[in-house]
């Protein structure tokens, strides 16, 4: 009787096309994970940006404004005029730019013009954040400064603080993050200016 004969079980052989499909899916899945990680990381960066200081502002020996936008200069000059420091350095100023040009461009009040001419030094040497920090180190050491307020864009502040703290380990650094008017970080994924 053929029903009594034991037949060896057939083990299913893995389909070769399934393995090939998995090999093709793996890079796509890894790319998707990478893109999701990048988006999540950028979202975290945007949500943790320093915000403008409110309340009483602590006096510092100096103010350092890193060029890159008129709003930074406006804030720096205002802080100086309000007595938040005795001296200010504008670092990374373009060649040929002087105080008279700044007065024209910024539309300063008389008190701000007086502060600009008496208490502000222009640094034309710095080309980047590392250069800003080196110029600031020389400037602050020449004046015996122990505390500085950094004025730069909010998205630039974390990097600037890192570089400046390495260059000026014995100087207390305070931040003054500027929220650029033309940068909408609440809807950064829709705003082309935010993405650049």
Task: Label every model-predicted segment.
Residues 1-24:
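N-terminal Lys/Arg-rich, disordered targeting/topogenic segments
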Residues 6-12, 28-34, 62-65, 92-95:
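Short N-terminal helix-initiation segments at or just after the protein's N-terminus
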Residues 18-53:
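N-terminal type II signal-anchor transmembrane helix
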Residues 45-190:
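A structural signal for short, hydrophobic/glycine-enriched beta-strand patches
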Residues 190-196:
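A transmembrane-helix-recognition feature enriched in membrane-embedded lipid enzymes
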């Amino acid at each position: 009787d053929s029903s009594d004969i034991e037949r060896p079980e057939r083990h299913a052989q893995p389909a070769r096309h399934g393995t090939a499909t998995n090999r093709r899916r793996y890079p796509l899945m890894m790319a998707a994970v990478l893109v999701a990680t990048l988006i999540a990381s950028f979202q975290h960066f945007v949500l943790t940006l320093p915000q403008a200081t409110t309340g009483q502002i602590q006096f510092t020996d100096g103010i350092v404004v890193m060029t890159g936008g008129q709003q930074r200069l406006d804030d720096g000059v205002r802080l100086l005029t309000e007595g938040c420091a005795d001296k200010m350095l504008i670092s990374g100023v373009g060649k040929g730019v002087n105080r008279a040009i700044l007065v024209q461009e910024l539309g300063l009040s008389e008190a701000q013009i007086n502060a600009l001419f008496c208490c502000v030094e222009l640094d034309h040497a710095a080309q980047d954040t590392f250069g800003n920090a080196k110029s600031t180190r020389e400037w602050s050491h020449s004046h015996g400064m122990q505390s500085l307020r950094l004025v730069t864009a909010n998205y630039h502040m974390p990097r600037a603080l890192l570089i400046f703290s390495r260059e000026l380990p014995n100087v207390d650094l305070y931040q003054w993050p500027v929220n650029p008017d033309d940068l909408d970080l609440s809807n950064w994924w829709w705003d082309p200016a935010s993405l650049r």
